[in-house]
Amino acid sequence: MTAVSPTAEGVTLGSQDLHVHTTMSDGEVPLEEVVRLAAERGVKVGIADHVSTRNPQRFVATDAQLRRYLERIEAEPVFVSAEFCWCDPLSTALPPEIMDRFDYRIGSNHGFSLPDDGWASPWWSDLPDPWNARPHELMDHMVANLCDLVTTMPIEIVAHSTFMPSGLMEIERDVHAWWTEEREDRFVEAVVASGVALEISNRYRLPHDRLLRKAKQAGARFTLGSDGHRAAQVARLDWAVETALRVGIGEGDMFVPERA
């Protein structure tokens, strides 16, 4: 069982994993097996497969696929969700009758816009020209995109929000060199103003403590997510629970969804 810790309110922290993938997108575990693992591990899960036209071979990308996806997860004892991409306008194009079937929606930075009309990737291991010579400018563009993401996407949760290109970390390993106080403050202000909950990601082990403490003090809401793609990851929240407790986040600070 994943770590589940009592809080001052007498409930448990870590009893909900709101970010799990299945074989309906790029996960390795079928839906029925996710349900079984969650029950075995004592955690209520939310199915949040990728719904995006950016990778139609792997993601839920068409109207017919999305309706089948919803029908399948609505029949299971799970929360109904999806992970939408900031770099894909699909989330703003879906009709209300579809969007209202989700218990909550997740938005993620899988690519962010640049002023030359190009796109950057948080997964860049090597920074291309000209950004290898202007890394802090690249970071400023990413933070600006994150602020726009939480204030404009029709979502309730932002996932793995502070994840950044490993090419930046190759230049300087200290996360605070990139997530400066000013950048943290800007993002936290946008998160709180939007009402979007900040995911504590067990998979990526972020956000970092200083940003989480600022967000807690500012009144942000939080969720815990495994971002589980493999059986060993599903409903595993040990690091996320430990981090929440370490920075003073309790059950009263959490976003708790209800079935639509």
Where are these predicted regions, by residue range?
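An N-terminally biased module of ancient metal coordination in phosphate/nucleic-acid-related enzymes
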Residues: 1-88, 97, 164-178, 186-187, ...
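Short, surface-exposed basic-aromatic patches at helix termini and helix-loop junctions that form
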Residues: 36, 95-100, 215-218
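Conserved beta-strand positions in the central sheet of alpha/beta enzyme cores
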Residues: 46-48, 106, 159, 199
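Flexible loop residues that form catalytic
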Residues: 50-51, 110, 163, 203
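Extended substrate/RNA-proximal surfaces in nucleic-acid metabolism proteins
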Residues: 59-193, 245
